[in-house]
């Protein structure tokens, strides 16, 4: 949902300076910010007939458009008030209050015609406000003699089939007509029957039969009005108040107003809110704030230049302006998307092209959303051409960014090699091989680094090509030093062979001496082992003899102990026998 436009009070949209119409930039800026479709209600009528009062009621405010209570006209030019539409979500109601027609104090009567024409051209509902009744003067004023048909040309200059008096080619562009009759005092009757206000309007615009000049003069404005305004509505208003209260009308509450007037006003506002259509261009293209702004500028420029504002040319001009703006909006959207999505350099060109195509599709969608009547896809082709140039530009930037990054990376990675070359580190036999190995190592390191972009190999190859001279110099130095080294190496090898032979012979001598020494050591060891064995055997024999002697002593001791025990037993036995005998003898005596 688009944000609501906060406009606390009306602003002058179109004024007049020294006979020329001028637009108010502040009001145009407000229009340019309204992205919603607009319902444009403009009111035109004689000065001092209460137009501003009706417009304030449509705005839902007691104050806003200037309401006067004197005979002087208050509103000058066209004033604009943009408010949220009370019954159509996502729509803005644009109210246009106009300078009163027929002001006796105004010198330039042509300005009336210009204001009148602009109100019709800009509105989707045109409110024609008159007093008392529909009379010939009111019809003539609406017709504005023959200037109305001239100012509202819509036919192609090449359209010769449309005859004078026919209506516009695309009636959808023209507003619905709402005729308001203020202080209406007549009875709504015809032929003795009650009629509606709409029937009263239709009866007032009926054509007379006949072809005489007087009849044609009578019919011409009516025919013109019928052709230009196929959708018509009429509202009649009783006097809002009586006497001195009329001068206080803006401050009166509904209770202080004529109840019939309050009812009439309510029905009028309800009709405007529910029936007023969105402003459209030929082809059914809805008008938003910027498109309405372009219409204002186009019509004012045409009128100031003395040209007649052709609706067809206006739509072409508007389409050109809006499509050009749509191209710029699409390009801006593309630039924003690319800046958000693309991080240069991309790893591959295809990655960048895929991002470009995604953003390109969105940009074209933005263009299609904000463009209209792009005949032959002229502006879309222009956009595609600009996007193609953008692609070339971003690809070049991508390549440049990749080249710069890779050059910096190469400088960092190959810096040690550069220092070694400067120090003639590779100016030695085999130096070229070492140089090439070092190059391969650093190239592998470089290729492993991520995010280098599309120029990685090209920048590397350029660097390697630049090092070809260095490589050849190292190779030549290597070859010269290698030849000398080969000769020196041969001599060194011969000397080394002699040294090795001497070492071999010396080793043989030493080994022989070591062998003899080892044999002597082994012989001595054998002798020592024999002596040790003899000593061990002798010691063992001595132990055996000692053991045997001990055993013999133990045997003898055991025999002696046995003999002693036998003797002791005999002695004990003898004692026992003696004791027995004594005891027995004692018994016999007693």
From Swiss-Prot:
Topology versus the membrane: Lipid-anchor
Where the protein is mainly located, per its record? membrane
Compartments where found: Cytoplasmic vesicle membrane; Golgi apparatus membrane; Cytoplasm
Q: What is its EC number?
A: 3.6.5.-
Q: What Pfam family does this protein match (any one)?
A: GBP_C
**PTM:** Isoprenylation is required for proper subcellular location.
Segments of this protein annotated with the region NLRP3-binding: 1-306
| Cysteine methyl ester: residues bearing it | 587
| Catalytic activity from the UniProt record | GTP + H2O = GDP + phosphate + H(+)
Which SUPFAM superfamilies does its entry note?
Answer: Interferon-induced guanylate-binding protein 1 (GBP1), C-terminal domain, P-loop containing nucleoside triphosphate hydrolases
Give positions of region: Required for tetramerization, but not for dimerization.
529-590
Please describe what happens when the gene is knocked out.
Mutant mice exhibit impaired host defense and NLRP3-dependent inflammatory responses. During LPS-induced sepsis, knockout animals show 60 to 75% reduction in IL1B and IL-18 serum levels compared to wild-type mice. Orogastric challenge with Listeria monocytogenes leads to higher bacterial burdens, discernible weight loss, and 50 to 80% fewer leukocytes expressing active CASP1 in mesenteric lymph nodes compared to wild-type counterparts.
What PANTHER family does the record point to? GUANYLATE BINDING PROTEIN (PTHR10751)
Question: What is annotated about its quaternary structure and interactions?
Answer: Homodimer; homodimerizes upon GTP-binding, forming a close face-to-face dimer. Heterodimer with other family members, including GBP1, GBP2, GBP3 and GBP4. May also form tetramers (dimer of dimers) in the presence of GTP. Interacts with NLRP3, possibly in its tetrameric form, and promotes PYCARD/ASC polymerization.
Identification of the protein by name: Guanylate-binding protein 5
Q: Which gene encodes it?
A: Gbp5
């Amino acid at each position: 949902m688009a944000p609501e436009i906060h406009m606390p009070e009306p602003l002058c949209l179109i004024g007049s300076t020294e006979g020329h119409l001028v637009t108010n930039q502040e009001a145009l800026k407000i229009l340019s910010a309204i992205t919603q479709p607009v319902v444009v209600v403009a009111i035109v009528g004689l000065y001092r007939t209460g137009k501003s009062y009706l417009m304030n009621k449509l705005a839902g405010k007691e104050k806003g458009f200037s309401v006067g209570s004197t005979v002087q006209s208050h509103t000058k030019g066209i004033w604009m008030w943009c408010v949220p539409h009370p019954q159509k979500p996502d729509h803005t109601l644009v109210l246009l209050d106009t300078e009163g027609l027929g002001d006796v104090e105004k010198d330039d009567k042509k300005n009336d015609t210009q204001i009148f024409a602009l109100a019709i051209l800009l509105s989707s509902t045109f409110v024609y406000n008159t007093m008392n009744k529909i009379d010939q003067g009111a019809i003539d004023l609406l017709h504005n003699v023959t200037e109305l048909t001239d100012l509202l040309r819509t036919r192609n200059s090449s359209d010769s089939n449309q005859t004078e008096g026919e209506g516009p080619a695309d009636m959808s562009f023209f507003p619905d007509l709402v005729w308001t009759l203020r202080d209406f005092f007549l009875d709504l009757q015809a032929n003795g029957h009650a009629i509606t206000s709409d029937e009263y309007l239709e009866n007032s615009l009926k054509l007379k039969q006949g072809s005489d000049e007087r009849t044609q003069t009578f019919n011409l404005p009516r025919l013109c009005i019928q052709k230009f305004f196929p959708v018509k509505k009429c509202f009649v208003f009783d006097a809002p108040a009586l006497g001195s209260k009329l001068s206080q009308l803006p401050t009166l509450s509904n209770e202080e107003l004529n109840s019939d007037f309050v009812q009439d006003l309510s029905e009028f506002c309800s009709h405007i809110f529910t029936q007023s259509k969105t402003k459209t261009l030929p082809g059914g293209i809805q008008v938003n704030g910027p498109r309405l702004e372009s219409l204002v500028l186009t019509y004012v420029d045409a009128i100031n230049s003395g040209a007649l504002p052709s609706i067809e040319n206006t739509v072409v001009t508007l389409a050109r302006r809006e499509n050009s703006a749509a191209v710029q909006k699409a390009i801006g959207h593309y630039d924003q998307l690319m800046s958000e999505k693309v991080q240069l350099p991309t790893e591959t060109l295809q990655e960048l092209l895929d991002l470009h195509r995604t953003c390109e599709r969105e940009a074209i969608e933005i263009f299609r959303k904000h463009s209209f009547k792009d005949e032959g896809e002229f502006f879309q082709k222009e956009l595609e051409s600009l996007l193609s140039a953008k692609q070339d530009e971003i690809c070049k930037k991508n390549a440049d960014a990749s080249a710069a990054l890779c050059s910096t990376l190469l400088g960092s990675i190959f810096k040690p090699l550069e220092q070694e070359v400067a120090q003639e580190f590779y100016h030695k036999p085999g130096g070229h091989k070492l140089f090439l190995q070092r190059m391969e190592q650093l190239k592998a390191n470089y290729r492993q680094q991520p995010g280098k972009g599309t120029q990685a190999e090209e920048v590397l190859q350029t660097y390697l090509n630049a090092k070809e001279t260095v490589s050849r110099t190292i190779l030549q130095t290597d070859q010269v030093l290698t030849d000398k080294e080969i000769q020196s190496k041969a001599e060194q090898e011969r000397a080394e062979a002699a040294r090795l032979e001497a070492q071999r012979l010396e080793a043989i001598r030493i080994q022989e001496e070591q062998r003899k020494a080892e044999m002597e050591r082994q012989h001595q060891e054998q002798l020592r082992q024999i002596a040790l064995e003899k000593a061990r055997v002798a010691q063992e024999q001595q132990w055996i003899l000692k053991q045997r002697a001990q055993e013999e002593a133990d045997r003898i001791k055991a025999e002696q102990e046995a003999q002693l025990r036998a003797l002791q037993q005999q002695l004990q036995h003898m004692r026992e026998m003696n004791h027995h005998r004594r005891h027995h003898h004692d018994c016999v005596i007693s």
